[in-house]
Amino acid sequence: MWFLTTLLLWVPVDGQVDTTKAVITLQPPWVSVFQEETVTLHCEVLHLPGSSSTQWFLNGTATQTSTPSYRITSASVNDSGEYRCQRGLSGRSDPIQLEIHRGWLLLQVSSRVFMEGEPLALRCHAWKDKLVYNVLYYRNGKAFKFFHWNSNLTILKTNISHNGTYHCSGMGKHRYTSAGISQYTVKGLQLPTPVWFHVLFYLAVGIMFLVNTVLWVTIRKELKRKKKWNLEISLDSGHEKKVISSLQEDRHLEEELKCQEQKEEQLQEGVHRKEPQGAT
């Protein structure tokens, strides 16, 4: 029973956040920014185990920054890349791909991959926050939203149909189109594996372990019993041989005694025959 209890304690509950894994958040919350802009990455852990020292990685290489916040001032193209972080004994975070752009207009988003049902916020951002009007948002080359004055666009609940390539355009002194074209992916919901499945799985493993143990013990006892039985047969066989040998010896002695008695009788008869002759 203790074995099954231990197995049940190992059962993971799907749908819960891994509280020991670091998570990167951005301020402002966009993964694409213009050159010379400032962006700060924060390394956060819900339940931080052990030491709170922080390590940052850019394109797989450890950086010299050891604080929970990684601040980039006056961003340049060299700051583009894949960022990860780790705090103390936490697991390393999922990567954040930061892009630094040049141009007059930029379509910004907080992530490039979303789970179905999550909100998607888009921002058509002008260089140095210049005023832009008659803003159009495009998906897969087709305009789908118009704002007379620049405004952020929020899709409250994303679904698979929102997958595609996005960009924006707007008017300033001239007609501008966003620098770079961003591909955004909406992943379908993955149904969590029910807890009962894990319980049944570990229960089956426990039963298999128990059955194997019982079989092993049974086979071991059977082997010991057979070994003892063979030994007893061997001993009995040896005893029978000794008894037979003893009987054979007794028979041989009896035969010798009979022969001896017969010889004595013959001698006595010979003596009796000689006595009458002497008397005559």
Swiss-Prot record:
Q: Where in the cell is it found?
A: Cell membrane
CDD domains in the record, alphabetically?
Ig1_FcgammaR_like (cd05752), Ig2_FcgammaR_like (cd05753)
Record's keyword terms, sorted: Adaptive immunity, Cell membrane, Disulfide bond, Glycoprotein, IgG-binding protein, Immunity, Immunoglobulin domain, Membrane, Receptor, Repeat, Signal, Transmembrane, Transmembrane helix
Predominantly, its location class is membrane
* Location of region: Disordered: 258-280
Q: Does the keyword Translocase apply?
A: no
One of the GO biological process terms: positive regulation of tumor necrosis factor production
Signal peptide stretch: 1-15
Stretches of the chain found on the membrane's Extracellular side: 16-198
Record topology, Cytoplasmic segments? 220-280
| Coiled-coil annotated spans | none
> Which InterPro entries does UniProt cross-reference here?
Ig-like_dom, Ig-like_dom_sf, Ig-like_fold, Ig_Fc_receptor, Ig_sub, Ig_sub2
Would the keyword Disulfide bond be found if you checked this record's keyword annotation?
Answer: yes
Residues of the Ig-like C2-type domain: 22-101, 95-184
What's one Pfam family the UniProt record gives for this protein?
Answer: Ig_2
Q: Which GO terms describe its molecular function?
A: IgG binding; IgG receptor activity; immunoglobulin receptor activity
Q: Name one GO cellular component term.
A: early endosome membrane
Which Cys-Cys disulfides exist here? 43-85, 124-168
Where are the glycosylation sites? 59, 152, 163
Q: Where are the transmembrane segments?
A: 199-219
- What are the inducing conditions? Up-regulated by IFNG/IFN-gamma.
Instruction: Report the protein's function.
Output: May bind to the Fc region of immunoglobulins gamma with a low affinity compared to FCGR1A. May function in the humoral immune response.
Record's protein name: Putative high affinity immunoglobulin gamma Fc receptor IB
